[in-house]
Regions:
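Short, surface-exposed loop/turn segments at beta-strand-coil junctions that are enriched for proline
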Residues: 411-416, 511-515
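Carbohydrate-active catalytic/glycan-binding domains of CAZyme proteins
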Residues: 20-343
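Sec-dependent N-terminal signal peptides
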Residues: 4-13
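Intrinsically disordered, low-complexity Pro/Gly/Ser/Thr-rich segments with frequent PxxP/GP/PP motifs
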Residues: 488-516, 525
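Terminal connector regions
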Residues: 511-537
């Protein structure tokens, strides 16, 4: 009888595991990626910490540092992120619930957002107070210094990270006649150059708010995630001085993807895994083998580079984490290789006829490119080349103050007119990985973002009215707009130059019956005769 019970229990466990794991086949080309190609290569060993006996967890995580991130025997922690105050202290806003809750991990919907503080970025973080009820928080600071802590279905706001009183509110969302992709949960935010905010929702839609609190306006009509099979969730977006970054997790396949963007709307996906189980490792090579790594969040340096990633981790299947058992969850901190600061010095656009490319590697505290870089190891160009060990090779170097200028032979760069941040991969003289993305002097990193609403039939004027708004940070370039209704073009009309956030309405004369609410529309934008954007309704 005991044997039968064991077999039934084992069968249930394996079925539960299979229900949460699907082996995703990697593209064959990923086998040829070099070190530095994958975002996953940026994870560094966790700082040395305290290891003790008699703690919760499966055997695979008993070697963990209990003082890393936040961990308490009686609390199951989950997602959260860290802000730093002007005194240098680190503030983690993280959700959690009593470990002995009747539903175990499934009590997550009743979680509380805690405010924890530490003098060290990696922790240990100690709870100082609670903010309120809520799950999967993400904290960000507004231009006026107030702090917003987003939670599913709402947010809390206070004057600062140390505030004792937090006020609850709800964001307003304007889908702008677009379908909301998979609802509005697990939102993630990035501050733009003008202190407005870009938001990505769980479904992969992109939204913009002028100040982080005003209505979020949807720009996209489809997800911006990689066009591959996956059960995507847990996006995290951030912006550094050069570009936007986005990581999204396929929770079923337990693989995450890394993307980059110049404007936060149009993305490229780099090859290789952003992270997989096992990225939490120690200096001696020992690995904390957590079953799941979810809710990634980044801490950024003064240049906006990600220097640490925090994860919600659990040692078993969520449904197997029961009250008063040996399983639980916590939030861990893993340092990241932040990358080099690079800039291309060629003033003219790089083309197939370009002979050499000059790249400046900036000196920083603790990094002297003139003495630390193994110049011969460097490769530079499009990520499509460099990630596979190809790209430009260095031919000589020059000194510029404390910085180093590396001159590359341009052949094989792979750089096209669409390139906005070419990549460098190499090693330092100790064999450690070096990488970075370079600013191009001829690229506009604050581009216009023209976006239309659904065309409306105007009975009085007998045509189509189309509202267009510039959500970008620069004035729009000369543009023509074409409306296609049920597959038939309604001709092109010139659009005047729109300043950031400016709205213009265009009227398209038509002798067709266009008042059908079920009609399908496309609004297409052309610049210099080339299609640059298409909105579908």
């Amino acid at each position: 009888m005991k044997k039968l019970f064991f077999l039934i229990a084992a069968s249930f466990f394996l079925t539960s595991v299979d229900a949460q794991i699907t082996e995703r086949e990697r593209p064959a080309e990923w086998q040829h990626l070099v070190k530095g190609a994958r975002f996953m290569d940026r994870f560094l060993p966790m700082p040395d910490g305290i290891q003790i006996k008699g703690i919760w967890g499966t055997d695979s995580v008993l070697n963990r540092y209990v003082d890393n991130g936040i961990e308490l025997p009686g609390v199951s922690f989950w997602g959260g992120n860290i802000l730093q105050d002007t005194d240098g202290k680190y503030h983690l806003f993280v959700c959690g619930w009593p470990e002995d809750s009747p539903k175990g991990h499934m009590f997550w919907s009743n979680s509380t957002v805690f405010h924890a503080v530490s003098d060290r970025l990696e922790g240990p973080l100690k709870i100082q107070n609670s903010v309120g009820k809520g799950h999967n928080p993400e904290a960000f600071q507004l231009k006026d210094g107030r702090v917003v802590v987003y939670v599913i279905d709402g947010y809390y706001i206070a004057d600062g990270v140390d505030s004792k009183v937090w006020t609850y509110g709800k964001f307003s969302f304007d889908s702008r006649d677009r379908k909301i992709i998979e609802g509005l949960s697990n939102l993630t935010f990035a501050r733009r150059q003008d202190d407005s905010y870009l938001m990505v929702c769980r479904g992969g839609g992109v939204w913009i708010s002028k100040d982080g609190l005003s209505p979020y306006m949807q720009l996209t009509d489809k997800r911006v995630y990689p066009d591959v099979e996956g059960r995507f969730e847990d996006p995290v977006v951030w912006r550094d001085e050069l570009q936007y970054h986005l990581i999204v997790n396929d929770w079923l396949g337990r693989i995450a993807f890394y993307q980059r963007s110049k404007d936060g709307v149009h993305w490229v996906t780099e090859q290789g895994e952003a992270y997989v189980p096992g990225v939490s490792f120690h200096k001696d090579g020992a690995v904390e083998h957590w079953f799941k790594y979810e809710r990634p969040k980044v801490f950024q340096d003064e240049k906006g580079r990600a220097v640490q990633m925090n994860f919600a981790v659990i040692d078993t299947i969520k449904w197997n984490d029961l009250p008063n058992d040996k399983h639980s969850s916590k939030n861990i901190s893993i340092p990241l290789n932040k990358g080099m600061l690079l800039s291309v010095l060629n003033e003219e656009e790089i083309t197939p006829s370009t002979r050499t490319i000059e790249v400046k590697i900036a000196a920083e505290s603790g990094f002297n490119p003139q003495t630390d870089v193994d110049v011969k190891s460097l490769r530079f160009g499009s990520f499509t080349e460099v990630n596979f060990g190809r790209g430009c090779k260095p031919v000589k170097t020059k000194v510029s103050g404390k910085d180093l200028i590396v001159v590359f032979k341009a052949k094989g760069s792979g750089i096209t007119s669409d390139e906005f941040a070419p990549k460098m991969i190499g090693k330092d003289k100790k064999g450690n990985m070096l990488y970075g993305y370079a600013r191009l002097p001829y690229v506009n990193y604050r581009p216009a973002l023209l976006s239309a609403r659904r065309p409306l039939f105007d009975k009085e004027k007998g045509g189509l009215k189309v509202e267009i708004q510039n959500f970008g940070l620069s004035a729009s370039e000369p543009t023509e707009v074409e409306v296609i209704c049920n597959g038939s073009s309604q001709r092109r009309i010139a659009l005047k130059t729109l300043q950031p956030y400016e709205i213009e309405c265009l009227m398209f004369d038509s002798d067709m019956l266009l008042s059908d609410d079920n009609a399908s529309y496309e609004v297409v934008f052309f610049q210099e005769g080339k299609e640059v954007e298409r909105n579908k309704f």
